[in-house]
Amino acid sequence: MRQFIRKNIWAVAPVVFVLVALVLLGSPLSSKVQETPAEDDNLIVVGVAQVGSESVWRSAHTQSIQDAFTRANGYMLIFDNARQKQANQIKAIRSFISQQVDYIVLSPIEESGWDTVLQEAKDAGIPVILIDRKVSVDDDSLYASWVGSDFVREGQDAGYWLEDYMKKQGREDDEVNIVVLKGTKGASATIGRTRGFNEVAKVQRNWNILQQVDGEFTTAKGKEEMARLLDQYEDIDVVVSQNDDMTFGALEAIREAGKTAGVNGDITVISFDAVDAGVELVRNGEINIDVQCNPDQGKYVEQIIQDMEDGKEIEKAYYLSLIHI
Protein backbone atom coordinates (compact mmCIF):
# COMPACT_ATOMS: atom_id res chain seq x y z
CA MET A 1 0.00 0.00 0.00
CA ARG A 2 2.76 2.45 0.91
CA GLN A 3 4.11 2.39 -2.63
CA PHE A 4 0.77 3.57 -3.96
CA ILE A 5 0.17 6.43 -1.54
CA ARG A 6 2.55 9.32 -0.92
CA LYS A 7 3.18 10.18 2.72
CA ASN A 8 4.65 13.56 1.88
CA ILE A 9 3.29 15.65 -0.97
CA TRP A 10 6.53 17.59 -1.30
CA ALA A 11 8.40 14.42 -2.15
CA VAL A 12 6.41 13.90 -5.34
CA ALA A 13 8.32 13.88 -8.61
CA PRO A 14 7.46 16.45 -11.31
CA VAL A 15 4.12 15.75 -12.88
CA VAL A 16 4.20 14.11 -16.29
CA PHE A 17 1.32 14.98 -18.55
CA VAL A 18 0.24 11.72 -20.14
CA LEU A 19 -2.94 10.34 -21.60
CA VAL A 20 -4.76 8.17 -19.12
CA ALA A 21 -8.25 6.72 -19.06
CA LEU A 22 -10.13 6.09 -15.86
CA VAL A 23 -12.22 2.97 -15.85
CA LEU A 24 -15.45 4.01 -14.22
CA LEU A 25 -17.34 1.14 -12.73
CA GLY A 26 -20.83 1.67 -11.49
CA SER A 27 -24.53 1.29 -11.67
CA PRO A 28 -27.36 3.49 -10.42
CA LEU A 29 -26.83 4.14 -6.73
CA SER A 30 -29.52 3.86 -4.11
CA SER A 31 -29.59 6.32 -1.24
CA LYS A 32 -28.55 3.63 1.21
CA VAL A 33 -26.78 0.35 0.65
CA GLN A 34 -26.19 -2.21 3.35
CA GLU A 35 -24.54 -5.60 3.18
CA THR A 36 -26.74 -8.42 4.43
CA PRO A 37 -25.81 -8.88 8.11
CA ALA A 38 -23.66 -11.95 8.55
CA GLU A 39 -23.80 -14.43 11.37
CA ASP A 40 -20.02 -14.21 11.57
CA ASP A 41 -19.27 -11.86 14.46
CA ASN A 42 -15.72 -11.45 13.17
CA LEU A 43 -16.81 -9.17 10.34
CA ILE A 44 -15.55 -5.60 10.66
CA VAL A 45 -18.51 -3.21 10.51
CA VAL A 46 -17.83 -0.02 8.54
CA GLY A 47 -20.25 2.90 8.22
CA VAL A 48 -19.67 5.15 5.22
CA ALA A 49 -21.13 8.66 4.95
CA GLN A 50 -20.80 9.61 1.27
CA VAL A 51 -21.34 13.06 -0.24
CA GLY A 52 -23.94 11.94 -2.77
CA SER A 53 -24.07 10.88 -6.41
CA GLU A 54 -23.77 14.31 -8.02
CA SER A 55 -21.21 13.37 -10.66
CA VAL A 56 -19.73 10.54 -12.68
CA TRP A 57 -16.59 10.82 -10.55
CA ARG A 58 -18.58 10.44 -7.33
CA SER A 59 -20.33 7.34 -8.65
CA ALA A 60 -16.96 5.77 -9.41
CA HIS A 61 -15.71 6.80 -5.97
CA THR A 62 -18.68 5.09 -4.32
CA GLN A 63 -18.11 1.96 -6.39
CA SER A 64 -14.50 1.77 -5.21
CA ILE A 65 -15.70 1.88 -1.59
CA GLN A 66 -18.31 -0.80 -2.17
CA ASP A 67 -15.76 -2.99 -3.92
CA ALA A 68 -13.32 -2.70 -1.02
CA PHE A 69 -15.69 -3.35 1.88
CA THR A 70 -17.31 -6.65 0.94
CA ARG A 71 -18.21 -9.63 3.07
CA ALA A 72 -15.63 -11.63 1.10
CA ASN A 73 -12.99 -9.18 2.34
CA GLY A 74 -14.24 -9.50 5.92
CA TYR A 75 -16.52 -6.49 6.21
CA MET A 76 -20.12 -5.53 6.75
CA LEU A 77 -20.77 -2.22 4.98
CA ILE A 78 -23.42 0.29 6.01
CA PHE A 79 -23.55 2.97 3.31
CA ASP A 80 -25.36 6.31 3.43
CA ASN A 81 -25.80 8.70 0.49
CA ALA A 82 -26.19 12.19 1.96
CA ARG A 83 -27.45 13.74 -1.28
CA GLN A 84 -25.11 16.70 -0.81
CA LYS A 85 -26.56 17.75 2.53
CA GLN A 86 -24.24 18.04 5.52
CA ALA A 87 -27.14 17.54 7.94
CA ASN A 88 -27.73 14.12 6.38
CA GLN A 89 -24.11 13.16 6.91
CA ILE A 90 -24.21 14.21 10.56
CA LYS A 91 -27.40 12.19 11.01
CA ALA A 92 -25.75 9.17 9.36
CA ILE A 93 -22.69 9.40 11.61
CA ARG A 94 -24.88 9.48 14.71
CA SER A 95 -26.73 6.45 13.38
CA PHE A 96 -23.42 4.64 12.91
CA ILE A 97 -22.46 5.51 16.48
CA SER A 98 -25.75 4.14 17.82
CA GLN A 99 -25.19 0.95 15.82
CA GLN A 100 -21.72 0.66 17.37
CA VAL A 101 -19.89 0.22 14.09
CA ASP A 102 -16.16 -0.49 14.22
CA TYR A 103 -15.09 2.31 11.87
CA ILE A 104 -16.66 5.37 10.26
CA VAL A 105 -15.55 6.55 6.82
CA LEU A 106 -16.53 10.13 5.96
CA SER A 107 -16.25 12.07 2.71
CA PRO A 108 -17.28 15.47 4.09
CA ILE A 109 -19.49 17.72 1.98
CA GLU A 110 -17.99 20.83 3.59
CA GLU A 111 -14.82 21.40 5.58
CA SER A 112 -16.39 23.04 8.63
CA GLY A 113 -19.10 22.05 11.09
CA TRP A 114 -17.80 18.64 12.19
CA ASP A 115 -16.33 19.18 15.66
CA THR A 116 -19.38 18.11 17.66
CA VAL A 117 -20.31 14.92 15.82
CA LEU A 118 -16.69 13.80 15.45
CA GLN A 119 -16.24 14.31 19.18
CA GLU A 120 -19.25 12.05 19.70
CA ALA A 121 -17.59 9.37 17.58
CA LYS A 122 -14.34 9.75 19.49
CA ASP A 123 -16.15 9.49 22.83
CA ALA A 124 -17.74 6.27 21.57
CA GLY A 125 -14.31 4.90 20.71
CA ILE A 126 -15.01 4.71 16.97
CA PRO A 127 -12.15 5.79 14.67
CA VAL A 128 -13.12 8.10 11.81
CA ILE A 129 -11.23 7.96 8.52
CA LEU A 130 -11.67 10.80 6.03
CA ILE A 131 -11.72 10.03 2.32
CA ASP A 132 -11.42 12.43 -0.64
CA ARG A 133 -12.21 15.68 1.18
CA LYS A 134 -10.87 17.13 4.41
CA VAL A 135 -12.35 18.75 7.52
CA SER A 136 -11.35 21.85 9.44
CA VAL A 137 -11.52 21.06 13.16
CA ASP A 138 -9.90 22.52 16.27
CA ASP A 139 -8.67 19.09 17.39
CA ASP A 140 -7.24 16.88 14.67
CA SER A 141 -7.37 13.87 16.98
CA LEU A 142 -11.08 13.75 16.11
CA TYR A 143 -10.17 11.73 13.01
CA ALA A 144 -7.62 8.97 12.60
CA SER A 145 -6.42 9.56 9.05
CA TRP A 146 -7.25 11.02 5.65
CA VAL A 147 -6.64 9.75 2.11
CA GLY A 148 -7.20 11.70 -1.08
CA SER A 149 -5.78 14.12 -3.63
CA ASP A 150 -3.87 17.36 -3.12
CA PHE A 151 -6.45 19.80 -4.43
CA VAL A 152 -4.18 22.83 -4.05
CA ARG A 153 -1.55 21.13 -6.19
CA GLU A 154 -4.21 20.28 -8.78
CA GLY A 155 -5.18 23.95 -9.03
CA GLN A 156 -1.56 25.02 -9.27
CA ASP A 157 -0.87 22.53 -12.04
CA ALA A 158 -3.83 23.86 -14.02
CA GLY A 159 -2.38 27.35 -13.71
CA TYR A 160 1.13 26.26 -14.67
CA TRP A 161 -0.26 24.43 -17.69
CA LEU A 162 -2.09 27.57 -18.86
CA GLU A 163 1.06 29.66 -18.40
CA ASP A 164 3.08 27.21 -20.51
CA TYR A 165 0.29 26.90 -23.08
CA MET A 166 0.13 30.66 -23.63
CA LYS A 167 3.91 30.77 -24.10
CA LYS A 168 3.78 27.99 -26.70
CA GLN A 169 1.02 29.91 -28.49
CA GLY A 170 3.20 33.03 -28.51
CA ARG A 171 0.53 34.80 -26.46
CA GLU A 172 2.32 35.26 -23.16
CA ASP A 173 1.95 39.04 -23.43
CA ASP A 174 -1.72 38.96 -24.48
CA GLU A 175 -4.56 39.81 -22.14
CA VAL A 176 -6.24 36.59 -20.99
CA ASN A 177 -9.82 36.77 -19.73
CA ILE A 178 -10.71 33.84 -17.49
CA VAL A 179 -13.91 32.57 -15.88
CA VAL A 180 -13.94 29.89 -13.20
CA LEU A 181 -16.72 27.39 -12.51
CA LYS A 182 -16.22 26.42 -8.88
CA GLY A 183 -17.60 23.32 -7.18
CA THR A 184 -19.72 22.95 -4.07
CA LYS A 185 -19.27 25.92 -1.74
CA GLY A 186 -17.18 25.00 1.29
CA ALA A 187 -15.92 21.69 -0.14
CA SER A 188 -12.20 21.09 0.24
CA ALA A 189 -11.92 20.27 -3.49
CA THR A 190 -13.40 23.68 -4.30
CA ILE A 191 -11.27 25.50 -1.74
CA GLY A 192 -8.04 23.78 -2.75
CA ARG A 193 -8.43 24.02 -6.53
CA THR A 194 -9.45 27.67 -6.27
CA ARG A 195 -6.55 28.53 -4.00
CA GLY A 196 -4.01 26.70 -6.15
CA PHE A 197 -5.09 28.27 -9.43
CA ASN A 198 -5.34 31.74 -7.90
CA GLU A 199 -1.80 31.46 -6.54
CA VAL A 200 -0.52 31.08 -10.09
CA ALA A 201 -2.92 33.59 -11.63
CA LYS A 202 -2.08 36.43 -9.25
CA VAL A 203 1.52 36.64 -10.48
CA GLN A 204 0.44 36.81 -14.13
CA ARG A 205 0.14 40.51 -14.88
CA ASN A 206 -2.07 39.99 -17.94
CA TRP A 207 -4.48 37.37 -16.57
CA ASN A 208 -7.91 38.75 -15.73
CA ILE A 209 -10.25 36.53 -13.73
CA LEU A 210 -13.59 38.00 -14.74
CA GLN A 211 -15.72 35.93 -12.35
CA GLN A 212 -15.54 32.84 -10.16
CA VAL A 213 -19.01 31.32 -9.77
CA ASP A 214 -20.50 28.34 -7.96
CA GLY A 215 -21.31 25.50 -10.35
CA GLU A 216 -22.05 22.95 -7.60
CA PHE A 217 -20.14 20.17 -9.43
CA THR A 218 -23.22 19.42 -11.60
CA THR A 219 -23.76 19.52 -15.36
CA ALA A 220 -26.98 21.52 -15.11
CA LYS A 221 -25.49 24.25 -12.93
CA GLY A 222 -22.33 24.35 -15.01
CA LYS A 223 -24.36 24.98 -18.14
CA GLU A 224 -26.54 27.58 -16.44
CA GLU A 225 -23.61 29.58 -15.10
CA MET A 226 -21.58 29.33 -18.31
CA ALA A 227 -24.54 30.55 -20.36
CA ARG A 228 -24.92 33.52 -18.02
CA LEU A 229 -21.21 34.33 -18.24
CA LEU A 230 -21.28 34.16 -22.04
CA ASP A 231 -24.18 36.61 -22.06
CA GLN A 232 -22.29 38.94 -19.75
CA TYR A 233 -18.84 38.79 -21.37
CA GLU A 234 -18.08 38.71 -25.08
CA ASP A 235 -14.36 38.11 -24.72
CA ILE A 236 -13.90 35.00 -22.56
CA ASP A 237 -10.61 33.31 -23.47
CA VAL A 238 -10.42 30.55 -20.86
CA VAL A 239 -12.86 28.60 -18.71
CA VAL A 240 -11.51 26.75 -15.69
CA SER A 241 -14.10 24.18 -14.63
CA GLN A 242 -13.42 22.38 -11.36
CA ASN A 243 -14.93 19.06 -12.44
CA ASP A 244 -15.87 17.29 -15.66
CA ASP A 245 -19.62 17.34 -15.06
CA MET A 246 -19.65 21.14 -14.94
CA THR A 247 -17.41 21.13 -18.02
CA PHE A 248 -19.94 19.04 -19.95
CA GLY A 249 -22.59 21.64 -19.18
CA ALA A 250 -20.25 24.52 -20.02
CA LEU A 251 -19.46 22.99 -23.41
CA GLU A 252 -23.18 22.78 -24.19
CA ALA A 253 -23.57 26.46 -23.33
CA ILE A 254 -20.57 27.41 -25.46
CA ARG A 255 -21.94 25.54 -28.47
CA GLU A 256 -25.40 27.05 -28.02
CA ALA A 257 -23.79 30.50 -27.94
CA GLY A 258 -22.27 29.85 -31.36
CA LYS A 259 -18.72 29.60 -30.08
CA THR A 260 -16.14 26.82 -30.18
CA ALA A 261 -14.08 25.31 -27.39
CA GLY A 262 -10.83 23.45 -26.92
CA VAL A 263 -7.88 23.08 -29.28
CA ASN A 264 -8.09 25.80 -31.97
CA GLY A 265 -11.40 26.93 -30.45
CA ASP A 266 -12.57 30.32 -29.26
CA ILE A 267 -12.32 29.31 -25.60
CA THR A 268 -9.59 27.26 -23.94
CA VAL A 269 -11.07 24.68 -21.56
CA ILE A 270 -9.35 23.43 -18.39
CA SER A 271 -11.18 20.67 -16.52
CA PHE A 272 -10.65 18.42 -13.50
CA ASP A 273 -11.32 14.74 -12.66
CA ALA A 274 -10.49 13.02 -15.98
CA VAL A 275 -13.47 10.68 -16.07
CA ASP A 276 -13.82 8.56 -19.22
CA ALA A 277 -16.07 11.05 -21.02
CA GLY A 278 -13.69 13.87 -20.14
CA VAL A 279 -10.71 11.94 -21.48
CA GLU A 280 -12.59 11.32 -24.73
CA LEU A 281 -13.26 15.05 -25.10
CA VAL A 282 -9.56 15.73 -24.63
CA ARG A 283 -8.84 13.27 -27.43
CA ASN A 284 -11.47 15.00 -29.58
CA GLY A 285 -9.93 18.39 -28.85
CA GLU A 286 -12.92 19.92 -27.04
CA ILE A 287 -11.10 20.01 -23.68
CA ASN A 288 -7.51 21.25 -23.65
CA ILE A 289 -6.41 19.60 -20.41
CA ASP A 290 -8.06 17.45 -17.74
CA VAL A 291 -6.42 17.27 -14.31
CA GLN A 292 -6.98 13.79 -12.92
CA CYS A 293 -8.43 13.17 -9.47
CA ASN A 294 -8.33 9.42 -8.87
CA PRO A 295 -11.69 8.10 -7.57
CA ASP A 296 -10.30 4.63 -6.79
CA GLN A 297 -9.74 5.39 -3.10
CA GLY A 298 -11.69 2.66 -1.31
CA LYS A 299 -8.84 0.16 -1.36
CA TYR A 300 -6.52 2.60 0.38
CA VAL A 301 -8.98 3.21 3.21
CA GLU A 302 -9.44 -0.54 3.54
CA GLN A 303 -5.66 -0.91 3.90
CA ILE A 304 -5.61 1.78 6.59
CA ILE A 305 -8.25 -0.14 8.53
CA GLN A 306 -6.28 -3.36 8.16
CA ASP A 307 -3.19 -1.61 9.49
CA MET A 308 -5.16 -0.32 12.46
CA GLU A 309 -6.55 -3.80 13.09
CA ASP A 310 -2.99 -5.14 13.08
CA GLY A 311 -1.88 -2.48 15.55
CA LYS A 312 0.37 -0.73 13.05
CA GLU A 313 1.11 2.97 13.16
CA ILE A 314 -0.70 4.94 10.47
CA GLU A 315 -0.03 8.32 8.93
CA LYS A 316 -2.32 11.28 9.46
CA ALA A 317 -2.56 11.99 5.72
CA TYR A 318 -2.01 9.99 2.55
CA TYR A 319 -1.85 11.81 -0.78
CA LEU A 320 -2.57 10.02 -4.04
CA SER A 321 -0.22 10.60 -6.94
CA LEU A 322 -1.14 13.20 -9.55
CA ILE A 323 -1.53 12.33 -13.24
CA HIS A 324 -2.94 14.66 -15.88
CA ILE A 325 -4.00 14.41 -19.50
Task: Say what each PLM segment does.
Residues 1-45, 70-71, 119-126:
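Short, low-complexity disordered leader/linker segments with a strong preference
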Residues 11-14, 25-44, 180-185, 200-201, ...:
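Hinge/cleft segment of the Venus flytrap/periplasmic-binding protein
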Residues 45-72, 77-91, 95, 99-101, ...:
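Extracytoplasmic "Venus flytrap"
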Residues 57-71, 75, 154-161, 188-207, ...:
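Short, solvent-exposed amphipathic alpha-helices that sit
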Residues 79-81, 137-164, 180, 212, ...:
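Short beta-strand elements at the ligand-binding edges of bilobed clamshell
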Residues 89, 146-175, 221-223, 274-278, ...:
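Hydrophobic alpha-helical segments within soluble ligand-binding/sensing domains
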Residues 106-123, 197, 211-280:
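Hydrophobic alpha-helical
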Residues 116-153, 177, 275-281:
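Flexible loop/hinge segments that line or gate small-molecule binding clefts
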